[in-house]
Amino acid sequence: MINFNELIKVGNFNKSHGIKGEISFVFTNNFFFKGKNSFLICEMEGIFIPFRVESYRSISNSTVLVKLKNINTIEQTKLLTYQEVFLPKKQSAENTKLNYFSWDHYIGFNIIDEKNREIGSITDIDKSTINTLFIVEKESKEILIPTANEMIVTIDEKRKIIYMKLPVGLL
């Protein structure tokens, strides 16, 4: 039996997609997307149930369409709609060892642009939109910067710096 204390929340299922059992999954950290996960866990009627991932495809920085094994109809996906999704903490720890961190890991890091200018310090992460955003404080102002992988040049874990190529007009 799966115990809640052994799990970490990684996101929520959202709505059904199509008629063949796909469901959108919004993940709140990148353990799922970057790791090698063969199943996701949901609580159903007080019991944690693993669902084998048959396939998935990315539709944004924080959303994938997931096809679960033996979930083949809209009716079946509706049972999972808006359910919290978990992974075993052990699996998350393995992903972390491979440098697959939650975006929250980067709170406190500084952002430096391609011209070597300090943009500011990450104070929070906004996961309320399709695109996850760094909330960066600079001179008492809040700047929202997308966490898009194509904008991240490199990450210096030791110095807590994220080097980014920012689009013109963002600042």
Curated annotation (Swiss-Prot):
It is found in: Cytoplasm. One of its GO terms (cellular component) is ribosome. Residues 97-170 form the PRC barrel domain. GO terms for molecular function: ribosome binding. Its main location: cytoplasm. It comes from the Bacteria. The keyword Cytoplasm applies. Keywords: Chaperone, Cytoplasm, Ribosome biogenesis, rRNA processing. Gene3D superfamilies: PRC-barrel domain (2.30.30.240), RimM (2.40.30.60). InterPro entries: PRC_barrel-like_sf (IPR011033), PRC_RimM (IPR056792), RimM (IPR011961), RimM_N (IPR002676), RimM_N_sf (IPR036976), Transl_B-barrel_sf (IPR009000). GO terms for biological process: ribosomal small subunit biogenesis; rRNA processing. Belongs to the RimM family. Binds ribosomal protein uS19. HAMAP family: Ribosome_mat_RimM. An accessory protein needed during the final step in the assembly of 30S ribosomal subunit, possibly for assembly of the head region. Essential for efficient processing of 16S rRNA. May be needed both before and after RbfA during the maturation of 16S rRNA. It has affinity for free ribosomal 30S subunits but not for 70S ribosomes. The PRC barrel domain binds ribosomal protein uS19. PANTHER family: RIBOSOME MATURATION FACTOR RIMM. This is Ribosome maturation factor RimM. It comes from Azobacteroides pseudotrichonymphae genomovar. CFP2. The lineage of its organism: Bacteria, Pseudomonadati, Bacteroidota, Bacteroidia, Bacteroidales. The gene is rimM.
